[in-house]
Amino acid sequence: MIQRILFIILLCLCSTSAFAQMEEALAPLDYALDSAETRQLRLEVDNMTFFKDNEFSGTVMKGCTLPGLWVTPKLTYQPLRNLKIEAGIHALIYSGAYRFPNYAYHDIAQWKGNQYQRGAHLLPWFRAQLTLRRVHLVLGDLHGAMKHRLAQPLYDPELMLTADPEFGFQLIADTRPAHIDAWVNWESFIFEGDTHQEAFVVGLSSRFRLNSEQSRWHVYLPVQGTIQHRGGEQDKGGSVQTLCNGAAGVGLRWNVGHKVVRYIGAEALALGCAQQKGKLWPFSGGSGLYAKVDVGFKYGLSARLGYFRANQFITLLGSPYFGAVSTKHDGACYPDHPQTAHLALDYSRTFGKHYALGAKVETFCNAPGRMRLADGTMQNTTTTFNTSFGIYLRINPSFLLKQF
């Protein structure tokens, strides 16, 4: 009863999803091509320097500290008004790390024997983008990570600091009634006789607008999903795995127009997951509920508190606090409707077109219920308060080298 009262109090006090302002500053939707850059050769440097500290307790997941940066210097050339080509190198660096595991990063990488790179985790970077009116086709490195605008139970923003850039194919359609982002992210390629599995993620993030975003009361319908497939024709050993996440709901945004409060928004999502093939998850399927309310203030301040409840729901790319399995204890899960109340306060500020600063404090009040261990035994758990703090500096300067 105490846990239920605590959740209700937290939800009523601050139910906000104000990460929107910080998203706009640190991960802007900058996929539109600029016709003024036609036939220009430019040097661009895309960088984020960060310090993030996760102080987590309990049985769900481990805490960690991420001090570092990633940087992508690249040459860009736009031969046509609607065609842009970019090529460069992506480097991920953590302070105090001098050797980096040499394989694909889907999260914080695990050490892998003598297969490593020195100084940084390096990857080639290439993107070709073609724009046809309101449709953008992308091959190579995608407009990914937080730019997909996936709900937090489906995508953990921390992956922007730990995972490799997404690579594959992407289609973005931005029309008056809808914004649609569909993509394939190829995570792992296998050669003949390889010992690991082929893996890729198919994703959809869409928002259907029932009226104009500038309306005083804006109503929209979000529909999102991710599917991960593991195994392929070259894979002779491991079993095929197909795992799915989905979300659909309704959102409301009140554009207040006050000198202090910019907007207040609310969103409710029904969540679902399914294990179509394989036995990687302890449950074959599940569902969940996620509700949030947004408040955006002047001067780049915003706040959020959301509420999550799971019924055997397992997240593919989201934080374990939005799911029913433990990443701290192998094979452990939570069959008794785990719940999480999430409060976030953030600040963001842009400096001109190419520079942005962000800071964020989060608290997760997690009540997972009983934990079922890998051997089938049940173990009681307690409600925990877990905090996270991060500060981020994003720079993306562009230098004209030659006009053809």
Model-predicted segments: where are they?
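Surface-exposed strand-loop-strand hairpins of Gram-negative outer-membrane beta-barrel proteins
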Residues: 48-70, 100, 114
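Sec/Tat signal peptide C-region and signal peptidase I cleavage site
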Residues: 16-20
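Transmembrane beta-strand segments of Gram-negative outer membrane beta-barrel proteins
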Residues: 29-54, 85
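Sec-dependent N-terminal signal peptides
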Residues: 2-14
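Surface-exposed coil loops of outer-membrane beta-barrel proteins
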Residues: 136-207
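Exposed, low-structure sequence patches enriched in small/polar residues
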Residues: 22-23, 46-50, 68, 125, ...
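Surface-exposed loop and membrane-interface regions of Gram-negative outer-membrane beta-barrel proteins
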Residues: 83-130, 152-153, 318
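Cleaved targeting-peptide boundary
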Residues: 21-29
